[in-house]
Amino acid sequence: MKNIAKYFLLLAALAACEDDDDDELPENPADAEYNVTIDPADFETSGITGNLFFPIEVGKTYIYEGSGVDGEVIRVTVEFTDQTKAIMGVTCVIVREMEYEDEQLIEDTYDWYAQDKEGNVWYFGEASQEIEDGVVVGTSGSWEAGVGGALPGIIMLANPLPNLWYRQEYLKGEAEDVAQVLSTAASASVPYGSFQGCLQNAEWNLLEPGVVEHKYYAPGLGLVKAIAVKGESGVEELVEIQ
């Protein structure tokens, strides 16, 4: 667990440097060196259930609806499959995400998540297909930890701390999503219900720093709302769980 411990000491140090009264994003998060060595012994090999704000329940499908940048109708399904994939010697759960725009499938993605023994959920990559008129036209955004310099990131901390920022993925120049914890006591109302004690994150891509989303994660449920707050418009809200 030494390497993971070093990773979180770095995060804690970055959080300590943040001004509690400053709501701005970290000035240059890309300036912080990112390096993590993965030891498969630090990760669960079975019974992967996620954590409070990112539960992993095999067989569940979350359905989100909303609007895109140009007002198009968006529908996203997120299915927690019973399939796994070994990446860097770590067992990852495969989660399939399908995005529809005006009822047409535009993206089909398989995400790979793992859980360490401290309860943090890691993101080991994705296989993504862009689709037009039923035909695959690209695989932009695809990456796999351990390949071509890519490293896994944290998709959800077991114990998120306000003001802390962290990398969710890392392939230099290709996949550089990061998140900053804004609150662990937020509220969110969506078609599926109203929730208190939510985690509110600012999430953005270092390659597109002018575009920022706020995401709300309900305890015991996971992501319930994502809304663009800078650079773009659009919102997705949880409407159903199957």
Regions found by a protein language model. Give the residues of each.
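Sec-dependent signal peptide recognition
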Residues: 2-10
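C-terminal motif of bacterial Sec signal peptides marking the signal peptidase cleavage site
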Residues: 13-16
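Conserved functional acidic sites
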Residues: 18-242
